């Protein structure tokens, strides 16, 4: 453990966790053992003295874009997807609080009975008080992904880096699950991610990150302790930057 926060390169970070990461090997919903492991990883980073914010996806419950493909109005489908992210945020909060991690859920869609509405200054104040802020509801707008929400919230919170937790250990030139010869990038530019149409994040999210010089690090959430390792420039990952 690093006792001196000044020894760390990244002191304020945003972690993007996909909905799929929360369901483990299930086809739908939550795998609580997996969520607890993620919460333990987050606690390890907090114990280093790092301020942590989180954006959760909702794909383990509902995917708006898939519903739109079968005829549902896209805006309506996206709003349902935003509600799914609130379910995930509250689930993650509950597991984290069982480990004595102070958290607050802030939703871009106001739901006063279950969580706080997203207010930038309030979110920053929570982080200053060493609370983990979990952002739910995406951006609050349809036609925007939770990756875009993660980039926006990271910039608004003045985070040093965005860490995207995925099912693979970085960015590849093709799907490593389908192509055993897929090439892994250790560093790659925003421009190359967009030009090569790499599916690590949607183009809008990458473009906003590039414009605001927000570095993105992609790593695997599957291996216990990876979050803390990646924060300290250890382990396997890909960095996306200028």
Swiss-Prot record:
It catalyses: UMP + ATP = UDP + ADP. Keywords: ATP-binding, Cytoplasm, Kinase, Nucleotide-binding, Pyrimidine biosynthesis, Transferase. It comes from the Bacteria. Pathway: Pyrimidine metabolism; CTP biosynthesis via de novo pathway; UDP from UMP (UMPK route): step 1/1. InterPro entries: AceGlu_kinase-like_sf, Asp/Glu/Uridylate_kinase, Uridylate_kinase, Uridylate_kinase_bac. Inhibited by UTP. It is found in: Cytoplasm. Homohexamer. NCBIfam families: pyrH_bact. This is Uridylate kinase. It comes from Rickettsia conorii (strain ATCC VR-613 / Malish 7). The gene is pyrH.
